[in-house]
């Protein structure tokens, strides 16, 4: 038996709100990541991070895991921002309403998905999957590398997507 009911279409205003909420959560999570890495001063020191990662003290290991957890959250939120931003752009007519082309490819077509962000997202997905399925083999240097790349390239990427979304919204109103 199939259900004949369909979900009502999502309004542009609801999509705008979802994008705004995602941007807010990204800012908060980036702040959390920056706070988490301060436990490994100076400037997210790999030696200090590795020592905490392998420590017998649970509070030190928790600090190391907090960095990894925030990185996972950033990856998931960036994927959400990409998906929501592209969908909003389609709804507003800023880009073609193409549901078959992956949102990341559509951002690339708009020159909004730089190679370094694409590479980071691949690395972060790999790290996230590895941490969920083979966590006992994950090493601190792998997390350290991805986190440093994220700290360097995600803030300008997130800002560019935010500016893009709010820019075409004003044009479409």
Where are the regions a protein language model picked out?
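Solvent-exposed interaction patches of small proteins and small membrane subunits
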Residues: 2-173
């Amino acid at each position: 038996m199939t259900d004949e009911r369909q979900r009502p279409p999502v309004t542009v205003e609801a999509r705008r709100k979802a994008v705004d909420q995602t941007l807010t959560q990204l800012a908060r999570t980036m702040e959390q990541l920056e706070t988490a890495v301060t436990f490994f001063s100076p400037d997210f020191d790999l030696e200090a991070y590795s020592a905490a990662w392998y420590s017998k003290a649970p509070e030190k290991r928790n600090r190391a895991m907090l960095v990894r957890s925030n990185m996972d959250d950033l990856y998931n939120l960036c994927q959400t921002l990409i998906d929501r931003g592209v969908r909003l752009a389609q709804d507003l007519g800023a880009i073609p309403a193409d549901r078959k082309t992956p949102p990341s490819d559509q951002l690339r077509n708009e020159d909004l998905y730089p190679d370094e962000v694409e590479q980071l997202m691949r690395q972060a997905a790999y790290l996230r999957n590895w941490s969920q399925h083979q966590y006992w083999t994950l090493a601190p240097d792998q997390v350290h590398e991805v986190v440093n790349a994220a700290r360097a390239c995600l803030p300008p990427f997130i800002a560019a997507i935010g500016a893009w979304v709010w820019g075409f919204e004003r044009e479409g109103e």
